[in-house]
Every structure is written in structure tokens, then in C-alpha cells.
Amino acid sequence: MPNQHILLSSNLLPVGSNISTWWNFGSMLLTCLILQTSTGFFLAIHYTANINLAFSSVIHILRDVPYGWIMQNTHAIGASMFFICIYIHIARGLYYGLYLNKKVWLSGTALLIILMATAFFGYVLPWGQMSFWAATVITNLLTAIPYLGVTLTTWLWGGFSINDPTLTRFFALHFILPFLIISLSSIHIILLHNEGSNNPLGTNPDIDKIPFHPYHSYKDVLMVTIMITILFTIMSFTPNLFNDPENFSKANPLVTPQHIKPEWYFLFAYGILRSIPNKLGGTLALLMSVIILTTAPFTHTSNVRSMTFRPLTQALFWTLIVTFITITWTATKPVEPPFIFISQMASAIYFSFFIINPILGWTENKL
């Protein structure tokens, strides 16, 4: 039976025996994707993409639709879970040198960019105060592009300001992009299992492999269960944990919030954008904060793949993590001293990681 052979081969997928919990975040991301797509579908059934009705339709989902509050809160908190998992997933990749599998790393970076775009479009849909003003600020960055900027912005808005056509196209994009994420995820997973995963030691795992099921499949199930438990605990007790208080008010183009900021998972990029007192420079820095990840496979100089046995690089890596958190924190603060200086320093350290890392790798080879 050919089907039996496929089942057997997936059951006996050989995997390195020493891959740790950090390798479980891929399956957790897949769970998040399934959760977001399914809850998103039920929300789309009841949502109305019209500037006069969008805010009311979200309230209608929460109050009147049976289990609508579960769908809406799971979708909103699920997005935060998605980004927590993806940031840990990327950090694991940087730490253990997984970026040397170039195709997997580059397809993953493309996935991150599309995911960020999808989340941004989704944040605009409830048409609350922060939704509207975050959309205004971020889409306005397109005007920084020389020659084409104003035309591109007008085209994206569907007019000369953010209005009904903008909301309609953002809803269309938010609906279609997850299917692109699903397609790219499939490619990402195929490319990964074509070569096989790395392990914490960074050594050749061929000498010691075990079947994926039951050993690693149960570990996956455990981590997914923990994640879903955390998600439902937040949803049950503090459903508005990640929400901005401004977003409980309907969008008003005549009243600007005191402090415009996107969702927490974009704050690191937003902090880098704000730290540069130039529109074009800030926009480029914003883009580079994510695109710079693509340089990692091409700037690796160490003879050792993983950071497990490289204490100098480990110190640099943890500096990057602290810097990431610092930028996120400063982006929540108003644009005034000392936050401007802290943000600028942290942004400089963030980018310097990708410059110092290859130099440090080369130095470690000489030790």
C-alpha cells in the first residue's frame, strides 16, 4: 500500500536525539497559524468593512454573536502569541547557527515580513482611535520614497486620506495574506526537512537519530498544550492585556491620541524608526531592522556553527536580546529625553550586532 509507506516514513522520520525545547516553537507557530486562520474566518463572517460600521460590528461580535467574544479575544491574543513564538524561533536560529541553512532562513525572513504586514492590516480593522492613527502614521512613511512616494500613498489609501476605500482594501489584504503565509510555511517546512534540522551542539546529527514519533511528537504536543493554556488563561482573566485603551474609542480624525504607538510586537521596529530624526532615514532603518536578518547566513565567519561553545558571541547575543527589549520599552514612552538618547543608543547596538558578530567569529577562530 503506497499510503501505508507514506504513513510509516512520516512516523519514522529520523530526528537528532538532542534537539531541545527551543526546537518546539515551529510546531507552536503552526498551531498559532491554524488558530488564527480559523478564528479569523468566523470573525470575517460578522465583520463589516465600512468606516461607519466597523467599530460597531466588532462590538456586535463581542456582545451578540454566540461565542463571538471567544473568537475575537482568541484572535487578538493569538496574534501576540504568534509573535512571542516567532521572536523566540528567530532568536533560537541566530543562537544555534540555523541560518546556515540559507533557503530555510531566507524563506523564514520572507514569512516574518508578510506576517508583520498581515498583523498591521489586522490592527487597523476594528477602526478604533489607535487603529486609525497607527495606520495614518505608518502608511504616511511611504511618502518618504523619492518621486513615487505620494503616488504610492494615494494609491494605497484609495484617496487623499485614510477613508472607507483604505479600510476595504486593508480587510481584503488581511484576508488574503494568511493564505500566502500558509503557502510559504509549507515551502519553509519542505526546505527544512529536505536537509534536516540542526541541533544544540551544531554537530552532524546523523550518528545519533531517533524516530520523530513518539519522542518529539509528544514534546511538541506538550509545548502546544502549554501555549494554548496560557492563551486561554489570558483570554479568561485579562482579555484586554495587550489592548491599547485608546482603541476602545471609535476612530476620530479630528482628535489625535497623546501617544501614537502600534501593537507591542512592532514596538522594536517603531522605536528604531522614531530614534532617527529624518523621515527617509527612519523609514530605511525600520525596513532594515527586519531585512538585516537576511545578512546572517552570508556573514558567518566562525568555524563552529552554534554559539554553545562560543562565550564571547554568547555575550553579544544576549546584548542583542536586552537591546531588543530596551527598544520595545522606549517605544512605549513619549519622544523626550532621556528616552530619545536611550532609543538611539539601543538602535545603534541592535544594528552593530550584525557587524560585530562576523568580526568576533573570525577572532574566535584565532584563539
Swiss-Prot record:
For biological process, the GO terms are: mitochondrial electron transport, ubiquinol to cytochrome c
* Record bears the keyword Heme: yes
Question: What kind of membrane protein is this, topologically?
Answer: Multi-pass membrane protein
Give the function comment from the record: Component of the ubiquinol-cytochrome c reductase complex (complex III or cytochrome b-c1 complex) that is part of the mitochondrial respiratory chain. The b-c1 complex mediates electron transfer from ubiquinol to cytochrome c. Contributes to the generation of a proton gradient across the mitochondrial membrane that is then used for ATP synthesis.
Q: Where does heme b b562 bind?
A: 75, 174
Q: Which GO terms describe its cellular component?
A: mitochondrial inner membrane; respiratory chain complex III
Q: What is its main location?
A: mitochondrion
Question: Which parts of the chain span the membrane according to its record?
Answer: 25-45, 69-90, 105-125, 170-190, 218-238, 280-300, 312-332, 339-358
Put simply, this protein is called Cytochrome b
